[in-house]
Amino acid sequence: CIMFHILKNYIDRNFNLLSFIAVVFCFVPLFYFSTNYVLNGWSYSDALINYSEGFIRRGLLGEIIFNIHKVTNLDIQKIHAYIFIFFTIINIFLYVLILKNISNIRFVYIFLLFNPLLLFFPLNDTGGYLRKEIIILTLMIFHCYLCNKYHSDKLSLSKYFLIFKTLIIPGIIINTLIHDIQLFLIPFHFILTLNVINKDFKILSYKNTFNKKNIILLFYIFTTIPFFIFILYPVSPEKINLIIKNVLLADPQ
């Protein structure tokens, strides 16, 4: 009985840490196989698009992978796997932190943590793993975490603005260069910032439109820069074929 109470108290005190460890442990087999096998041929080939023949949409991640390969001489497939293991662990960590703040009911917490349609989706469908969307999801979860911290009075408005300008906006631009689907998710980040500025969305009323705090929203204009770059550098079949040849030379897989 005493041991039971000691164990219960330990679990209660460290529930979030244990939750994080449990989820990561569930992902270990997927992490292992991803470093030894190509789990998703389409997403792997998509990740290796790079700037070897000049600028191209979705080419940033591939450029990073090949530059790491040149510096470290690590296997390209393993570099690709390690990058996604890194971002998946970050996603799990941030997700647990958000759940810690929004759910005091243990059953709801566990349901959201192990829901097969949420964090555990890649375990149910490995085709959903190793996709660039995981990196985009990292920024979305991180922004949600910041908003949660702000509304919990654990993050000041000035600190939010600083992180917003130095991480969120550059992160959106970088993610767009990795995968152009990020352009369609800019409204998600915009609404989160809107919610920080005024949780009642009073900004939508005319008299609040020109509030000084609202100037921060103009930073979202910078997130459209990649869109215009894409227009200036259209994709051509010739360029794609040359990139494919370069990739096959470096990684026959």
Model-predicted segments: where are they?
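Transmembrane-helix signature of polytopic, membrane-embedded enzymes
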Residues: 96-119, 159
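Transmembrane-helix motifs of polytopic, lipid-linked glycan transferases
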Residues: 82-105, 142-146
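Perimembrane helix-loop-helix junctions
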Residues: 186-221
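Membrane-lumen/periplasm interface segments of specific transmembrane helices
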Residues: 27-37, 211-253
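Specific aromatic-rich, kink-prone transmembrane helix
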Residues: 134-154, 164, 188, 195
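Membrane-interface alpha helices of multi-pass inner-membrane proteins
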Residues: 162-180, 185-187, 191
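Aromatic- and kink-enriched transmembrane "portal" helix at the membrane-lumen/periplasm boundary
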Residues: 59, 110-138
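Short hydrophobic/aromatic helix or loop-helix immediately within or flanking a transmembrane segment
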Residues: 52-86
